[in-house]
């Protein structure tokens, strides 16, 4: 409407008679555009872009990539340093009697550090937080996307978990992804003198939580110590299986038969044995992560080679390379003749991790493949005096032309009756 009004005024001024003795009318004054702007409808100023609310590190990510700041390995708060030492003696006990005080925080942006987590969870009394730790890559210092926050008591941690889980993180539009940490921050897995009385529970519906799984078994078996639903590292959602630990072997044996086919939420559970894997005469040291993965030794952090098993003979190097290409730059692809397997080596470790997670159990060629970590050609194993190659201290493996592969771990999605878990082992069962 404003444009129409301006145009009509212009036409009206042109229709006025012009006197011959007078000079032509002067050109429009320079203020004319301002006059037109006055006739335009007023609009509110454009708000600043959303990303401006983020810390400066988000605006200059490349600087962080090439010159990461020196992050502290562990963040503790001096005003209750004494409390941390007073409670150290009870950490192991608390982790197994329901008094866990540490929560896992996932889906962290790379700029979210210990100070960010502390300010996010600290209420009026900062002394409720004992320690904060963001897990970082040991080579470049960048965040791995998750961390741990330890509180003074289980009640405080439980309150934070219930109140914050699913709410929006400060300065983002992303919700908090929280869960109980299986063990206190920085602690190794507790070694039990007796056998590990755990069972595998499969076919869980997506809504089954640790608490629901625990209640389902503890109502009938009082010796149940803990229950864990395995979560996807990227989405934080259930992978559809979990584990229940018992304190009594007889109750564990009964549960294997009595609970098989019993419904938990909306689905019937499938029960199987879960046996802790031991190698070289000692129990593997490590911690359960709430996302369902096992903390691994630092020696393989640079490994970028993936072993691909179950290849049919018609698959070529190019066929194998194609599905992996979308995850990042590839160094090489090799398929040993007549072995039914192959090796894909990436440039970057994160690309290899994503490919392993996404492509395991998919079809390449005509068969479903199984993926596991291989070994870079540069990291050949030393040989003993008999010519045998030593394998990784916690993975058995075989080698071919400098490449190696860990003993593949069947995916529960591929073998419905095979109870496997990163910390547990089992015997593969035949499926029709």
Swiss-Prot record:
Keyword Oxidoreductase (UniProt): no
UniProt keyword terms in alphabetical order: mRNA processing, Nucleus, Repeat, RNA-binding
UniProt xrefs under Gene3D superfamilies: 3.30.70.330
Expression sites by tissue: Expressed in leaves, stems, flowers, and seedlings.
Compositionally biased region (Pro residues): 22-32
A single GO cellular-component term on record: cytoplasmic stress granule
Role description: Heterogeneous nuclear ribonucleoprotein (hnRNP)-protein binding the poly(A) tail of mRNA and probably involved in some steps of pre-mRNA maturation.
Subunit structure, as described in the record: Interacts with the poly(A) tail of mRNA in nucleus.
Official protein name in the record: Polyadenylate-binding protein RBP47C
Species: Arabidopsis thaliana (Mouse-ear cress)
């Amino acid at each position: 409407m404003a444009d129409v009004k301006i145009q009509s005024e212009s036409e009206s001024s042109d229709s006025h008679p012009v006197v011959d003795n007078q000079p032509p009318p002067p050109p429009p004054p320079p203020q004319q555009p301002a006059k037109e702007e006055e006739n335009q409808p007023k609009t509110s100023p454009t708000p600043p872009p959303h990303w401006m609310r983020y810390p400066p590190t988000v605006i200059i990510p490349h600087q962080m990539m090439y010159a990461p700041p020196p992050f502290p390995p562990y963040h503790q708060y001096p005003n209750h340093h004494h409390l941390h030492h007073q409670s150290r003696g009870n950490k192991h006990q608390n982790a197994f009697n329901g008094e866990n005080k540490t929560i896992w925080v996932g889906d962290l942006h790379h700029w979210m550090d210990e100070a960010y987590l502390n300010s996010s969870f600290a209420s009026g009394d900062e002394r409720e937080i004992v320690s904060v730790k963001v897990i970082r890559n040991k080579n470049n210092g960048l965040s791995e996307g998750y961390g741990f926050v330890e509180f003074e008591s289980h009640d405080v941690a439980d309150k934070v978990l219930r109140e914050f889980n699913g709410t929006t993180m400060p300065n983002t539009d992303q919700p908090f992804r929280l869960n109980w940490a299986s063990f206190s921050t920085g602690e190794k897995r507790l070694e039990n003198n007796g056998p590990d009385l755990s069972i595998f529970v499969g076919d869980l519906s997506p809504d089954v939580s640790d608490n629901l799984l625990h209640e389902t078994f503890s109502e009938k078996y009082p010796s149940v110590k803990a229950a864990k639903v395995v979560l996807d590292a990227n989405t934080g959602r259930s992978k559809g299986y979990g584990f229940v630990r018992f304190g009594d072997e007889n109750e564990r044996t009964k549960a294997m038969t009595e609970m098989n086919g019993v419904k938990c939420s909306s689905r019937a559970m499938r029960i199987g044995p879960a046996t802790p894997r031991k190698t070289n005469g000692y129990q593997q040291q490590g911690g359960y992560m709430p996302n369902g993965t096992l903390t691994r030794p630092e020696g393989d952090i640079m490994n970028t080679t993936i072993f691909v098993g179950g290849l049919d003979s018609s698959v070529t190097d190019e066929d194998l390379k194609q599905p992996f290409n979308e995850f990042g730059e590839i160094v090489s692809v090799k398929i040993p003749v007549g072995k039914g397997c192959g090796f894909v080596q990436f440039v970057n470790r994160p690309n290899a991790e994503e490919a392993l997670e996404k492509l395991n159990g998919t079809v390449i060629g005509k068969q479903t493949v199984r993926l596991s970590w291989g070994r870079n050609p540069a990291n050949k194993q030393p040989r003993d005096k008999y010519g045998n190659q030593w394998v990784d201290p916690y993975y058995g493996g075989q080698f071919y032309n400098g490449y190696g592969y860990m003993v593949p771990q069947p995916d529960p999605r591929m073998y419905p009756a095979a109870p496997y878990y990163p910390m547990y082992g089992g015997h593969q069962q035949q499926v029709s």
